[in-house]
């Protein structure tokens, strides 16, 4: 199959689709995909039809959702249509709300009614569902790479499901996506014949066997074992496709019901002047990946500094940012540019150096930019002053410079915070707003104000700077 985006044409002209689905209004549109609400003619089920114009995003999303079929906290793909010279069309379950809408509603309630926005029990239940979904990805060595509230969809009965896998990367080989150009539709069945609901109790991940998409049980993996396996995968050069050779922001700027929301990345499509050139950096024969993925506010330091050798840990940082936003109803690091993003992280965690992250000096952009020493970092506790020590301790396990120090999803699910009083509320007691977040509402803090700034330069707003030539280019120092 040609790996160039197919010519876009209306989904209404596809006979194999209109024979099975009654297509209603378009509910989302972007540069690389359109989403329609539709009804399955055989049983009246309301679904979302996602037509993807970009080969890379389509391949990734189909591959990941096929592997994760049956995971209770991952969006369901019922089937998909994909032929030579045609756009892929995914048939997804229709979910009308997302976590960004929940956070926005919580912020409104806090302003009108006072209080904290969410109860501790509500936050715990949301986090358990998020962690369970990400754990399913990581058990199958799938890196989502764009975790944020707008990509966490919610059913009417409170079940949260991860969505928008257009930037996902699979760190192991799967032969999932069919390549027969004569075949029109590929149907997926749930493993047990129906969609399972998430458990009302916290899963015992330490003692339960791990199960992959093939149904085979796997032993629980320690953190050391995980890192060993990832290094082996990199050494064996099993990252098989070349889809990271382009900037992977395709689904980041699309607003779609049941799939994704408008991203803050739309002013950041190009790489800034100090960033590692991912187009030149990515060498699939060496198992490298692009650093230009994910939404900036949730992007970890290793990506901000241009790393192309990373793993599941990038999702763990993003999880920490989502957790912090649930707690405070504000984004933790709402950077207006990549430099501003690094600056905000530095002001909270302190300067990045070998002491806090051994090996950080080898990051592609580490020597290209530096900030004055932060004498008194704000710290996570400074960002969330009204929260308990247990909450701060949990966040610090995710929001830390060294990727190897971040807690895995398994460790997070077994943390005492999630099992002690006050207990997580039942899923049925979670309030779900009737609609999902609209454009530019993925995180609530005045994003439109940021976008109205006169210049999109990463260097504006920082005052004086020192640019020094070096043998390999230049460095930028901010006082």
Curated annotation (Swiss-Prot):
Entry GO MF terms: ATP binding; cyclin-dependent protein serine/threonine kinase activity; protein serine kinase activity; protein serine/threonine kinase activity; RNA polymerase II CTD heptapeptide repeat kinase activity
Gene Ontology CC terms: cytoplasm; nucleus
Record PTM Phosphothreonine, positions in chain: 290
SUPFAM superfamilies, alphabetized: Protein kinase-like (PK-like) (SSF56112)
EC assignment: 2.7.11.22, 2.7.11.23
Catalytic activity: L-seryl-[protein] + ATP = O-phospho-L-seryl-[protein] + ADP + H(+); L-threonyl-[protein] + ATP = O-phospho-L-threonyl-[protein] + ADP + H(+); [DNA-directed RNA polymerase] + ATP = phospho-[DNA-directed RNA polymerase] + ADP + H(+)
Tissues in which the UniProt entry reports expression: Highly expressed in suspension cell culture. Expressed at low levels in all plant organs.
Compositionally skewed regions (Basic and acidic residues) per UniProt: 442-454
Binding site for ATP: 27-35, 50
Superkingdom, natural source: Eukaryota
Post-translational modification Phosphotyrosine, affected residues: 32
Record-given protein name: Cyclin-dependent kinase F-1
Organism whose genome encodes this protein: Arabidopsis thaliana
């Amino acid at each position: 199959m040609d790996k160039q985006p197919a010519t876009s044409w209306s989904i209404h002209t596809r006979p194999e689709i209109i024979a099975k689905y009654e297509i209603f209004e378009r509910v989302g549109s972007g540069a690389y995909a359109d989403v329609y609400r539709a009804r399955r003619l055989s049983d009246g089920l309301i679904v979302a039809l996602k037509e993807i114009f970009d080969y890379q995003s389509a391949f990734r999303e189909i591959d990941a959702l096929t592997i994760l079929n049956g995971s209770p906290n991952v969006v369901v793909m019922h089937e998909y249509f994909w032929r030579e010279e045609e756009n892929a069309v995914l048939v997804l379950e229709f979910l009308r709300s997302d976590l960004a809408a929940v956070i926005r509603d919580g912020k409104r309630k806090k302003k009108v009614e006072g209080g904290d926005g969410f109860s501790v029990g509500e936050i715990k239940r949301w986090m358990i569902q998020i962690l369970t979904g990400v754990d399913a990805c990581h058990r199958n060595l799938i890196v989502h790479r764009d975790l944020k509230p707008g990509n966490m969809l919610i059913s009417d009965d409170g079940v949260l499901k991860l969505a928008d896998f257009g930037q996902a990367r699979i760190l192991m080989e799967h032969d999932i996506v069919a390549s027969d150009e004569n075949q029109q539709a590929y149907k997926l069945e749930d493993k047990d014949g129906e969609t399972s609901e998430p458990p009302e109790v916290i899963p015992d991940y330490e003692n339960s066997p791990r199960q992959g998409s093939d149904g085979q049980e796997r032993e629980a993996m320690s953190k050391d074992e995980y890192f060993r396996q990832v290094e082996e995968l990199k050494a064996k050069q099993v990252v098989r496709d070349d889809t990271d050779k382009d900037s992977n922001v395709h689904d980041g700027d699309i607003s779609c019901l049941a799939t994704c929301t408008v991203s803050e990345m739309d002013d950041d499509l190009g790489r800034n002047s100090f960033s590692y050139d991912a187009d030149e950096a990515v060498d699939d024969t060496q198992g490298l990946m692009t650093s230009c993925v994910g939404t900036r506010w949730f992007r970890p330091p290793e990506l901000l500094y241009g790393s192309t050798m990373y793993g599941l840990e990038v999702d763990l940082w993003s999880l920490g940012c989502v957790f912090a936003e649930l707690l405070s109803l504000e984004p933790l690091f709402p950077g207006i540019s990549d430099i501003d993003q690094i600056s905000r992280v530095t002001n909270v965690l302190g300067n990045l150096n070998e002491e806090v992250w051994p090996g950080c000096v080898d990051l592609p952009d580490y020597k290209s930019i530096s900030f004055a020493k932060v004498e008194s970092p704000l710290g996570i506790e400074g960002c969330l002053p009204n929260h308990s020590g247990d909450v701060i301790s949990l966040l610090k396990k995710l929001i830390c410079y060294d990727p190897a120090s971040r807690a895995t999803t398994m460790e997070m699910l077994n943390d005492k915070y999630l099992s002690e009083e006050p207990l997580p509320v039942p899923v049925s007691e979670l309030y779900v707003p009737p609609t999902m977040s609209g454009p530019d509402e993925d995180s609530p803090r005045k994003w439109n104000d940021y976008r109205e700034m006169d210049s999109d330069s990463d260097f504006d707003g920082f005052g004086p700077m020192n640019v020094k030539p070096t043998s390999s280019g230049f460095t930028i120092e901010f006082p």
